[in-house]
């Protein structure tokens, strides 16, 4: 039993992460917690005598090392139960009953995850939670009730943030936090040919605050794109430092939040090569941006000046605005 969520979070923190999100259940339907409603969970395995709770371990590790915990819930697919793109297999009354049952199951699982682990930073529904008036469960009221300060991502009615349109770790330039809709994906956006451009750039005239995030797996180099561990993986799949810095500048540097996927190996640990690269990355971010030569601020000014005591070589300018009241 080498699984160590402390090691996961320490690796993320070394890169400069401020929050971490755990995939609590994905497309198989298997849950990484002690579920009372989903028997396909850690209760069903011999590991830790069937009493393990990786969600709890993860949340505890986040709080121990000062990262905000979030939970990722995959309900769009469930291979065990025959759910494909939210839809239960089959036709007729039997399929309709299974659909209704699956929606209630999802709501109960979300209730468990929202009520057992204290305050959460984000609830992330992979592929969304769809339309509660259609195939999707009605999860938004559950999150609102039990996690009122939590970021919600997402269903057809609401997205507190938006995907940046690719899994490249970058967004477009410019990238506005404002958006024309309070959601990022819905039936109204299906088939819109330039929707990915809208996701990548936002809309300066948008009425809704839906900031962008850029995501990518750390093991996305050399022809790979691995969100999960793959047999035969090696350090050649890990992005080089220069690629990661380019992503940082084209995501964080363009007004987006960068989210990087880490995958434990079969022993339950982040591989040594990944840990080393994350530490290198955090060090390089600090080297470039951690100690500015000078800084200034101003309000309602068209020009700002910075004066040095002696000539200085400057290779970066970092410009930010106060976004507490919008852009």
What residues fall within each predicted segment?
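Mature catalytic domains of secreted/periplasmic carbohydrate-active enzymes
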Residues: 1-327
């Amino acid at each position: 039993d080498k699984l160590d969520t402390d090691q996961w979070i320490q690796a993320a923190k070394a890169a400069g992460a401020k929050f971490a999100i755990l995939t609590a259940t994905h497309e198989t339907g298997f849950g990484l917690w002690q579920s009372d409603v989903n028997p396909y969970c850690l209760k069903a395995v011999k590991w830790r005598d069937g009493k393990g709770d990786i969600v709890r371990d993860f949340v505890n590790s986040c709080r121990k090392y000062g990262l905000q915990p979030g939970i990722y819930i995959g309900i769009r697919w469930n291979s065990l139960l025959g759910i494909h793109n939210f839809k239960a297999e089959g036709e007729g009354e039997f399929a309709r009953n299974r659909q209704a049952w699956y929606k209630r199951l999802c709501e109960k699982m979300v209730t468990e995850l929202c009520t057992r682990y204290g305050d959460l930073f984000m609830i992330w529904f992979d592929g969304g939670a769809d339309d509660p008036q259609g195939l999707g469960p009605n999860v938004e009221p559950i999150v609102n009730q039990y996690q009122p300060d939590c970021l919600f991502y997402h269903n057809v009615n609401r997205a507190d943030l938006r995907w940046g349109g690719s899994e490249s770790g970058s967004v477009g330039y410019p990238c506005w936090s404002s958006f024309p809709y309070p959601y990022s994906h819905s039936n109204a956006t299906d088939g819109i040919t330039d929707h990915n451009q809208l996701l990548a750039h936002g809309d300066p005239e948008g009425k809704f605050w839906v900031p962008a995030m850029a995501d990518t797996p750390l093991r996305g180099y050399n022809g790979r794109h691995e969100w999960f561990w793959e047999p035969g993986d090696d350090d050649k799949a890990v992005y080089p430092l220069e690629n990661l810095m380019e992503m940082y500048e084209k995501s964080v540097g363009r007004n987006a939040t960068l989210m990087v996927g880490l995958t434990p190996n079969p022993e339950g640990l982040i591989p040594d090569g990944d840990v080393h690269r994350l530490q290198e990355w955090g060090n390089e971010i600090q080297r470039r941006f951690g100690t500015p030569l000078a800084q200034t601020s101003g309000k309602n000014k068209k020009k700002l000046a910075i004066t040095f005591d002696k000539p200085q070589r400057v290779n970066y300018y970092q410009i930010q605005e106060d976004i507490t009241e919008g852009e």
